[in-house]
């Protein structure tokens, strides 16, 4: 099969030079990213006018930019497929779905950031610009179909993430988190480059499509080695065991709004990359990479949820929880069926709201108390019923308790796994889900202790809520929105699953993989 970009140029050979350039670039495919880029530039320009001006104008600029990106993504849904930038980017439904998850995660992360930034003395303009840069890299990564565009997008996301992790310069934990993230991330980038060089040497091209065709006829040990290198990079981005060591320290030391974005936006980009490169390139090694992913999924679900039991920090507990959640999502990838891929997309959308809702509650609590310890939440319902209710619902959803949105997300994943005879993954998933429910409910039980004397000292001295302070209203909007979707979304899970199914059905890359699985099943 010829390369997409070359095929497009061949069919348009008689076009005028200007028209040919427009057709080969097809810049309309990246208009959502263009909106984010313009918002980032405008944010930097406004920041030059001073902190007071930035505090007033940066939030609406970010809202307009991200809102425009989401509208443009909606317009791209089911649009005719045309490769852009000579086949280096493809805005199929899969890319649109994951880019929408990332843009929404950034929007919600910004809503819960303003009060935190004001309280900690963080420059709003710089922070928002770096977060938008990370968003830009993550969104481009979802549609990248070329090794060069993948690496550029990956590094844009990574470098911005390093800066965000260490943005609290006066906090030693933040600097430590940034350094650890930088060192491990740089190693992962080097490993990916080495794997990419092997793929280029085997195929003579950087196009994923051409590489996939070349590997069909060249299942050499070098190709298998490149698979290991690429898989290691993907596992690092999604924080899968044993490439998870950076996650607890980075989550604990980084600013909480940054952790909220990394837990969803960066993870969504990682899974989009996994689908694009593993399914698109390594079809000839389908059994091998699925076996490796099965091992990673079992390890991630087990270690993530078991180690979370012993945590005393709320952010560190959610860090290990996110490792376990990555293992659940990997079940859909291992299945390789339409239901599996759709359940994977659905669960990422559900994880967006329930995880960011939990982080909104944690930020609201830490702003008032300065504490991150789980024990300090004891008796919180007496002083702050809103946080108690919101955090309880989000944690129950993360644990998979019906009728929350997270329950239906897990059920779809487990059904897809069982239908594809992935019994080990489903059984491990069910057992570790029960383990996760234990530590989630332990937090809830602590918050709703009945006797006033059992409340923590932090809660006893809990300050009154002042919603008139700068950044509090956006935080409340994000909190209520996330909790509302998490609680009510379970009832609306069928339309959400239809949306996820449509994302898979209209993506040729996934349909080819599904057909391959079907042929092997018949064989």
Curated annotation (Swiss-Prot):
<dbReference type="Pfam" id="PF00361">
    <property type="entry name" value="Proton_antipo_M"/>
</dbReference>
<keyword id="KW-0521">NADP</keyword>
<feature type="transmembrane region" description="Helical">
    <location>
        <begin position="221"/>
        <end position="241"/>
    </location>
</feature>
<feature type="transmembrane region" description="Helical">
    <location>
        <begin position="317"/>
        <end position="337"/>
    </location>
</feature>
<dbReference type="InterPro" id="IPR001750">
    <property type="entry name" value="ND/Mrp_TM"/>
</dbReference>
<feature type="transmembrane region" description="Helical">
    <location>
        <begin position="255"/>
        <end position="275"/>
    </location>
</feature>
<keyword id="KW-0520">NAD</keyword>
<keyword id="KW-0874">Quinone</keyword>
<keyword id="KW-0618">Plastoquinone</keyword>
<feature type="transmembrane region" description="Helical">
    <location>
        <begin position="132"/>
        <end position="152"/>
    </location>
</feature>
<feature type="transmembrane region" description="Helical">
    <location>
        <begin position="182"/>
        <end position="202"/>
    </location>
</feature>
<dbReference type="GO" id="GO:0048038">
    <property type="term" value="F:quinone binding"/>
</dbReference>
<dbReference type="GO" id="GO:0031676">
    <property type="term" value="C:plasma membrane-derived thylakoid membrane"/>
</dbReference>
<feature type="transmembrane region" description="Helical">
    <location>
        <begin position="29"/>
        <end position="49"/>
    </location>
</feature>
<feature type="transmembrane region" description="Helical">
    <location>
        <begin position="389"/>
        <end position="409"/>
    </location>
</feature>
<keyword id="KW-1278">Translocase</keyword>
<comment type="similarity">
    <text>Belongs to the complex I subunit 2 family.</text>
</comment>
<comment type="subunit">
    <text>NDH-1 can be composed of about 15 different subunits; different subcomplexes with different compositions have been identified which probably have different functions.</text>
</comment>
<dbReference type="GO" id="GO:0042773">
    <property type="term" value="P:ATP synthesis coupled electron transport"/>
</dbReference>
<dbReference type="GO" id="GO:0019684">
    <property type="term" value="P:photosynthesis, light reaction"/>
</dbReference>
<feature type="transmembrane region" description="Helical">
    <location>
        <begin position="424"/>
        <end position="444"/>
    </location>
</feature>
<comment type="function">
    <text>NDH-1 shuttles electrons from an unknown electron donor, via FMN and iron-sulfur (Fe-S) centers, to quinones in the respiratory and/or the photosynthetic chain. The immediate electron acceptor for the enzyme in this species is believed to be plastoquinone. Couples the redox reaction to proton translocation, and thus conserves the redox energy in a proton gradient. Cyanobacterial NDH-1 also plays a role in inorganic carbon-concentration.</text>
</comment>
<feature type="transmembrane region" description="Helical">
    <location>
        <begin position="477"/>
        <end position="497"/>
    </location>
</feature>
<feature type="transmembrane region" description="Helical">
    <location>
        <begin position="345"/>
        <end position="365"/>
    </location>
</feature>
<dbReference type="GO" id="GO:0008137">
    <property type="term" value="F:NADH dehydrogenase (ubiquinone) activity"/>
</dbReference>
<dbReference type="InterPro" id="IPR010096">
    <property type="entry name" value="NADH-Q_OxRdtase_suN/2"/>
</dbReference>
<keyword id="KW-0812">Transmembrane</keyword>
<keyword id="KW-0813">Transport</keyword>
<feature type="transmembrane region" description="Helical">
    <location>
        <begin position="94"/>
        <end position="114"/>
    </location>
</feature>
<feature type="transmembrane region" description="Helical">
    <location>
        <begin position="291"/>
        <end position="311"/>
    </location>
</feature>
<keyword id="KW-0793">Thylakoid</keyword>
<keyword id="KW-1133">Transmembrane helix</keyword>
<feature type="transmembrane region" description="Helical">
    <location>
        <begin position="57"/>
        <end position="77"/>
    </location>
</feature>
<protein>
    <recommendedName>
        <fullName>NAD(P)H-quinone oxidoreductase subunit 2</fullName>
        <ecNumber>7.1.1.-</ecNumber>
    </recommendedName>
</protein>
<keyword id="KW-0472">Membrane</keyword>
């Amino acid at each position: 099969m010829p390369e997409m970009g070359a095929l497009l140029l061949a069919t348009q050979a008689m076009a005028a030079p200007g028209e040919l350039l427009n057709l080969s670039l097809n810049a309309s495919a990246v208009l959502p990213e263009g909106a984010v880029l313009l918002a980032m530039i405008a944010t930097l320009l406004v920041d030059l006018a001073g902190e007071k001006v930035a505090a007033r104008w940066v939030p609406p600029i970010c809202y307009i930019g991200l809102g425009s990106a989401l509208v443009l993504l909606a317009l791209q849904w089911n649009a005719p497929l045309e490769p852009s930038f000579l086949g280096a980017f493809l805005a199929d439904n899969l890319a649109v779905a994951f880019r929408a998850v990332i843009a929404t995660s950034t929007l919600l992360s910004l809503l819960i950031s303003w009060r935190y930034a004001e309280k900690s003395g963080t420059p709003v303009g710089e922070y928002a610009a770096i977060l938008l840069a990370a968003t830009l890299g993550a969104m481009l990564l979802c549609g990248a179909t070329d090794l060069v565009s993948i690496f550029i997008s990956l590094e844009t996301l990574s470098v911005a993430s390093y800066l965000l992790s260490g943005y609290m310069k006066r906090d030693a934990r933040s600097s430590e988190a940034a350094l650890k993230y930088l060192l491990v991330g740089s190693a992962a980038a080097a490993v990916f480059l080495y794997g990419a060089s092997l793929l280029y040497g085997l195929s003579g091209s950087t196009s994923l499509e051409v590489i996939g065709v070349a590997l069909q006829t060249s299942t050499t040990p070098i190709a298998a080695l490149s698979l290991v290198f690429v898989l290691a990079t993907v596992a690092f981005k999604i924080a899968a065991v044993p490439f998870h060591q950076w996650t607890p320290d980075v989550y604990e030391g980084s600013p909480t709004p940054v952790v909220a974005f990394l837990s969803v936006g960066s993870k969504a980009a990682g899974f989009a990359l996994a689908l694009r490169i593993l399914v698109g390139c390594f079809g000839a090694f389908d059994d091998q990479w699925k076996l490796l992913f099965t091992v990673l999924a079992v390890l991630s679900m087990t270690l993530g949820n078991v180690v979370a039991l012993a945590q005393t920090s709320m952010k560190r507990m959610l860090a290990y929880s996110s490792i376990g959640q990555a293992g659940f999502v990997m079940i859909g990838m291992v299945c390789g069926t339409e239901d599996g891929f759709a359940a994977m997309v659905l669960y990422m959308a559900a994880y967006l709201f329930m995880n960011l809702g939990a982080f909104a509650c944690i930020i609201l609590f830490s702003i008032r108390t300065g504490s991150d310890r789980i024990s300090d939440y004891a008796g919180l319902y007496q002083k702050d019923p809103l946080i108690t209710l919101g955090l309880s619902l989000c944690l129950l959803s993360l644990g998979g308790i019906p009728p929350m949105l997270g329950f239906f997300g897990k059920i779809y994943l487990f059904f897809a796994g069982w239908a594809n005879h992935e019994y080990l993954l489903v059984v491990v998933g069910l057992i570790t889900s029960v383990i996760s429910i234990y530590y989630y409910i332990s937090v809830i039980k602590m918050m709703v202790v009945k006797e006033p004397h059992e409340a923590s000292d932090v809660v006893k001295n809990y300050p009154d809520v002042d919603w008139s302070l700068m950044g509090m209203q956006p935080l409340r909007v994000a909190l209520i929105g996330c909790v509302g979707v998490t609680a009510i979304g379970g009832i609306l899970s069928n339309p959400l699953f239809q949306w996820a199914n449509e994302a898979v059905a209209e993506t040729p890359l996934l349909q080819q993989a599904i057909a391959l699985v079907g042929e092997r099943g018949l064989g």
